[in-house]
């Protein structure tokens, strides 16, 4: 039923309806959190008070030793002022020619 109402109202009406419902859910969420904090269920009976053991934490994984001498990407440190130009020249032979429209380009 709600979906058919939203479809009839259009975008603005649907947005307005969603905002109103969001306010209702916010109010409901605060009520639920208060009832959960009180320690009683909805019927007024105390909740099951059995002691639960805290969740066990997994054993910490030992960290791997950090070793800079085994770095494999050596070209990463091989930059110079002309690195980009060298690569540009190297890759230019693989570039495809740009298509032409058939007319001359404008002179600037």
Swiss-Prot record:
GO CC terms, sorted: mitochondrial inner membrane; respiratory chain complex I
One annotated GO biological process: mitochondrial ATP synthesis coupled electron transport
Domain of life: Eukaryota
Pfam families from the UniProt entry: NDUFV3 (PF15880)
Spans annotated as Disordered: 33-72
Lipid bilayer topology: Peripheral membrane protein
Phosphoserine modification, residue list: 105
Chain segment of the transit peptide: 1-34
InterPro entries per UniProt: NDUFV3 (IPR026193)
Major site of localization recorded for this protein: mitochondrion
Keywords, sorted A to Z: Electron transport, Membrane, Mitochondrion, Mitochondrion inner membrane, Phosphoprotein, Respiratory chain, Transit peptide, Transport
Location within or outside the cell: Mitochondrion inner membrane
Keyword Mitochondrion recorded: yes
Entry-linked PANTHER family: NADH DEHYDROGENASE [UBIQUINONE] FLAVOPROTEIN 3, MITOCHONDRIAL, NADH-UBIQUINONE OXIDOREDUCTASE
Recorded family membership: Belongs to the complex I NDUFV3 subunit family.
Role this protein plays: Accessory subunit of the mitochondrial membrane respiratory chain NADH dehydrogenase (Complex I), that is believed not to be involved in catalysis. Complex I functions in the transfer of electrons from NADH to the respiratory chain. The immediate electron acceptor for the enzyme is believed to be ubiquinone. May be the terminally assembled subunit of Complex I.
Oligomer status and interactors: Complex I is composed of 45 different subunits. This is a component of the flavoprotein-sulfur (FP) fragment of the enzyme.
Protein name: NADH dehydrogenase [ubiquinone] flavoprotein 3, mitochondrial
